[in-house]
């Protein structure tokens, strides 16, 4: 059923990809030079490592270690637990590594458009927990296996709940909620909510709270 869902969505998403991809690619090259595509190793289903494709939104000379240091500081311990308790957001405030066009691409989520390539390669789904880099995945401890039991997605439940404004603990909570509550109807709701949050306004999906 998940494969049928992805194929159906790809029928509509590929024309969007073909239209916007060359435009954004050229804008990045003109504005910030090569490369326009950022390739990074991420953790996929069952812990398999794959190469994720995104549009580059940061200066080519930016310090990648800063991101890892930020995550470890947020975790404040070797592993994290899922929780809805408010915490420090994942987002790095006033991140001067992000380019001008990168700010627009991140705000509209168009930086994730090359993820379509990963979906076509069978490494990702259209909806699912976002693929993590290896050092992020290690922070999940015993929750790694459950979170990585499904394919990562272009968008997911955590993304429509707050994306980078969530804490690491909140994101893990919603990722686990998705895995435990997965169904096609939920996928359609998340997809619709993603479109709404990008193009109209930012609202929230709600799931029944566990007792």
Regions found by a protein language model. Give the residues of each.
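A hydrophobic, helix-centered structural microdomain
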Residues: 1-67, 184, 189-205
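A generic structural signal for residues located within well-ordered alpha-helices
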Residues: 18, 93-96, 111, 186
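Short pre-functional
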Residues: 14, 104-106
